[in-house]
Amino acid sequence: MMFKNFPFFKGKKDTSFDHLVEEVKKGYIPEHIAIIMDGNGRWAKRRAMPRIAGHHEGMQVVKKITKFASKLNVKVLTLYAFSTENWKRPKKEVDYLMKLPEEFLGTFLPELIEENVQVRVIGQQDRLPTHTRRAMEKAMEETKENTGLILNFALNYGSRDEIVSAVQHMMKDSEEGKVRVEDVSEEMLSSYLMTSSLPDPELLIRTSGELRISNFMLWQIAYSEFWFTDVYWPDFTEEHLLNAITDFQHRGRRFGGV
């Protein structure tokens, strides 16, 4: 079932936010939270600003939410940063988006290291500009020994492309005698995906009011709980994330059972 905002905190304004955080942490925290960060352009348009201003503001929110997810002991935070379809956007906007990882990591990497955060990337990295790829590679190298939150960027990522690539690699291994047809299973296909070393997302969040998945982790979200909000990504706060997790904690996850 899909929900929008869950008014759990209504009437609790006299309770400190830190206390609410501690109460939520007593419950089950999703191991893997995936977020479709949507609405940067519309946020900027409403303020008569260029779309890139929305992306810049959204970058600041990534910093804030990453630190908060780490505080909540979330194990994996996957952020849909740039899809394989986003190349269709105006060149000026795409060029700016390709500079954002460099800017983001240039200022935030020391904090990520201090917070014990490990940076990872999924997506077709070979098509990224050299400066973008180098910024991501540097961050991954410098945080690879960290054991805290895994900050996983989906950059030039498309789920259908990922699944096709997985099947191609599986067929190649079959031709080389490494895989037998009778061995093919869900677990085997999962092992060929870019997320093979990560647990599937338990909670998927999408901002901006759009109610669609947009080719994001289609295989991995088979049993994820969805949480939608009308809030644009630049306005997304720690309270919104806490609200989503609280909603998650109040749902009954049956995985096809009763």
Swiss-Prot record:
Binds 2 magnesium ions per subunit. The active site is at D38, N86 (proton acceptor). Substrate binds at residues 39-43, 51, 55, 83-85, 87, 89, 206, 212-214. GO terms for cellular component: cytosol. Its cofactor is Mg(2+). It comes from the Bacteria. InterPro entries: UPP_synth-like, UPP_synth-like_CS, UPP_synth-like_sf. Mg(2+) binds at D38, E225. PANTHER family: DEHYDRODOLICHYL DIPHOSPHATE SYNTHASE 2, DEHYDRODOLICHYL DIPHOSPHATE SYNTHASE FAMILY MEMBER. Belongs to the UPP synthase family. This is Isoprenyl transferase.
